[in-house]
Amino acid sequence: MKVLNELRQFYPLDELLRAAEIPRSTFYYHLKALSKPDKYADVKKRISEIYHENRGRYGYRRVTLSLHREGKQINHKAVQRLMGTLSLKAAIKVKRYRSYRGEVGQTAPNVLQRDFKATRPNEKWVTDVTEFAVNGRKLYLSPVIDLFNNEVISYSLSERPVMNMVENMLDQAFKKLNPHEHPVLHSDQGWQYRMRRYQNILKEHGIKQSMSRKGNCLDNAVVECFFGTLKSECFYLDEFSNISELKDAVTEYIEYYNSRRISLKLKGLTPIEYRNQTYMPRV
């Protein structure tokens, strides 16, 4: 209708309506609607800001939760429609994720048994290693994730999948523990977790080791899901010319994931917000 109205200065309206096969009443109805103030103008502006602040990682559900956090009452269907009018769509590149494997062989039972729900921080941890490739070189990430709020509580980056990478990750994680806390630490059957050195470190800190069954990636689904999210929202969205750039991007993303990226499963809170708002530590 806007285009037809602009063309009126060059052509008779009747000819334009006839060519467009639009009744005169319909034309004036929409013309009147166009002249009204847009009641969603402020909301659309904020939707666009939220979308771009998160680099296009948010779909309409997370955008809706972000608006709710700011006190704006609007349902997800309206947000979905408004994002459509703004041509805003989550810019996530979904690819089939394959985690880093290496040699497998079990040395500990599956204590976790796919029970990924934790009632307090530092009750259940999960870990694994994933790899990235940039121009023929590789980068490995080894994190510890707390199942209470899916927070990455420690991590280590290395250009080689060495035991020292895992030990550095553990050292960081142990600093988060209070004296009375002895979590279960679940992993797959990777060679790092079968090393006597790894097992002794866990025993020294009162950590109970748990391992997935052979060939069952769902036994460690939370950390696998995190790797998939990390690669979709960080690695696949940019092009990296070297490992140094990738290290910086992964470091920035983990900070974003913990402190700024809201989670649907955490009632619209970030992992750190959820921990701070829902758990009262034991004195």
Curated annotation (Swiss-Prot):
SUPFAM superfamilies: Ribonuclease H-like. PROSITE patterns: INTEGRASE. The keyword Mitochondrion does not apply. Keywords: DNA recombination, DNA-binding, Transposable element, Transposition. Pfam families: HTH_21, rve, rve_2. InterPro entries: HTH-like_dom, Integrase_cat-core, RNaseH-like_sf, RNaseH_sf, Transpos_IS3, Transposase_IS3/IS150/IS904. GO terms for biological process: DNA damage response; DNA integration; DNA recombination; transposition. GO terms for molecular function: DNA binding. It comes from the Bacteria. Induction: A shorter open reading frame encoding a protein called DinS, encoded by a 0.4 kb mRNA encoded within the insK transcript, is repressed by LexA, induced by DNA damage. The keyword Transmembrane does not apply. Residues 117-279 form the Integrase catalytic domain. Involved in the transposition of the insertion sequence IS150. Belongs to the transposase IS3/IS150/IS904 family. This is Putative transposase InsK for insertion sequence element IS150. The lineage of its organism: Bacteria, Pseudomonadati, Pseudomonadota, Gammaproteobacteria, Enterobacterales.
